[in-house]
């Protein structure tokens, strides 16, 4: 590890292979916590490259719990977090809207690191069993259409690193790679990131991971979600080609909503917001979810255009299908799934 730390101190980039090997060392129980913290801080200070991100993703996916089944059409809409905006759980709420539109959602997530309420905190508050095993997740994806993949369960080797990340309380490369380390072989993905200069590198990593289609967004105000505040910077991966563009919400009929207007709170407060959206209440929260879910449906290919995606998202909510998916997941995730273990 010392060789890699020296390179980072000197501001040098690591190659993909060096980062892969460094990643395996980070997961080794014999490494010192001070070495892990130093590596994460130095890497953040230098700035991460696509090669470094992919190298670490390789290491983490190699050490993750294995999945035996390929779920056709599975997607994730997990964001990086780390934007400091303290918004409500936009992507987690949107995940049920996607599921209600007949998209299989393998939602990768964790407890809060730099926010008040992470996806795991919200789902636990809503009554979802967040600790499903790979076999149970396969079952949930096949029969419910949505499953939650709790990062500490999927990546047991990350336990020490999670503790250090919490103590550091600053975004690290693990914020960036969280959405990229989903152990399910996804076909499509919608990723919100907090660092605008990482849009292209993250899209390049998704391409290397074999995604058929993907959309990476950095929202107005550097939100790690699509924002109704103004211009959103986007990179689209389709047919193995990467295109950079921008998206204005007003083009799709949305009123301007400042990011401060969609702040969330603790898990109870955010659960109330999520249930309100899924129950069809009209609000700035609903509009934000419609925009993000619409983009995700476009990224998935379920919708041919963003406009169609927004229409499908609204139907998912207003038909009751999105809320039904939440209730199904609560029930099924808490069953004793002995038949699949």
UniProtKB/Swiss-Prot annotation:
Cofactor note: Binds 2 magnesium ions per monomer.
Binding site for Mg(2+) 1: 91, 225
Binding site for Mg(2+) 2: 224-225
Keyword Glycosyltransferase among UniProt keywords: yes
EC number: 2.4.2.18
Keyword Metal-binding: yes
Gene3D superfamilies (alphabetical): Nucleoside phosphorylase/phosphoribosyltransferase catalytic domain, Transferase, Pyrimidine Nucleoside Phosphorylase, Chain C
Catalytic activity line of the entry: N-(5-phospho-beta-D-ribosyl)anthranilate + diphosphate = 5-phospho-alpha-D-ribose 1-diphosphate + anthranilate
Cofactors: Mg(2+)
Binding site for anthranilate 1: 79, 110
UniProt binding sites for 5-phospho-alpha-D-ribose 1-diphosphate: 79, 82-83, 87, 89-92, 107-115, 119
Bilayer-crossing regions: none
Any one GO MF annotation of this record: anthranilate phosphoribosyltransferase activity
GO aspect biological process, one term: L-tryptophan biosynthetic process
Residues binding anthranilate 2: 165
Keywords: Amino-acid biosynthesis, Aromatic amino acid biosynthesis, Glycosyltransferase, Magnesium, Metal-binding, Transferase, Tryptophan biosynthesis
The protein's assembly and partners: Homodimer.
Recorded family membership: Belongs to the anthranilate phosphoribosyltransferase family.
Function: Catalyzes the transfer of the phosphoribosyl group of 5-phosphorylribose-1-pyrophosphate (PRPP) to anthranilate to yield N-(5'-phosphoribosyl)-anthranilate (PRA).
HAMAP family documented for this protein: TrpD (MF_00211)
PANTHER family: ANTHRANILATE PHOSPHORIBOSYLTRANSFERASE
Name recorded for this polypeptide: Anthranilate phosphoribosyltransferase
Source species: Bacillus cereus (strain ZK / E33L)
Species lineage: Bacteria, Bacillati, Bacillota, Bacilli, Bacillales
Gene: trpD
């Amino acid at each position: 590890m010392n060789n890699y730390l020296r390179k980072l101190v000197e501001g040098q980039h690591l190659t993909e292979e060096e980062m892969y090997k460094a990643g395996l060392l980070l997961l080794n129980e014999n490494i010192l916590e001070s070495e892990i913290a130093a590596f994460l801080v130095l890497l953040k200070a230098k700035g991460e490259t696509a090669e470094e991100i992919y190298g670490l993703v390789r290491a983490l996916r190699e050490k993750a719990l294995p999945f035996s089944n390929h779920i056709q059409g599975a997607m994730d809409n997990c964001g990086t977090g780390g934007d400091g905006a303290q918004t409500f759980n936009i992507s987690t709420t949107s995940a049920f809207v996607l599921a209600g539109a007949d998209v299989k959602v393998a939602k990768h997530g964790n407890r809060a690191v730099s926010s008040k309420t992470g996806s795991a905190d919200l789902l636990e508050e809503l009554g979802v069993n967040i600790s499903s095993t790979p076999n149970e997740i396969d079952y949930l994806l096949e029969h419910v259409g949505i499953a939650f993949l709790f990062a500490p369960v999927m990546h047991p080797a990350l336990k020490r690193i999670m503790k250090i990340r919490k103590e550091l309380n600053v975004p690290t490369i693990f914020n960036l790679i969280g959405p990229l380390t989903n152990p399910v072989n996804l076909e499509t993905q919608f990723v919100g990131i907090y660092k605008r200069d990482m849009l292209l590198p993250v899209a390049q990593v998704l391409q290397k991971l074999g995604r058929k289609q993907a959309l990476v967004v950095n929202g107005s105000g550097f939100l790690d979600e699509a924002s109704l505040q103004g211009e959103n910077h986007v990179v689209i991966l389709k047919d193995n080609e990467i295109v950079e563009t921008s998206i204005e919400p007003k083009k799709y009929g949305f009123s301007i909503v400042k990011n401060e207007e969609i702040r969330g709170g603790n898990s109870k407060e955010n659960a109330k917001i999520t249930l309100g959206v899924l129950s069809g209440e009209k609000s700035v929260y609903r509009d934000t979810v419609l925009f993000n879910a619409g983009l995700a449906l476009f990224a998935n290919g379920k919708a041919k255009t963003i406009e169609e995606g927004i229409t499908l998202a609204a139907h998912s909510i207003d038909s009751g299908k999105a809320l039904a998916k939440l209730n199904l997941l609560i029930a099924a995730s808490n069953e004793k799934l002995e038949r699949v273990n």
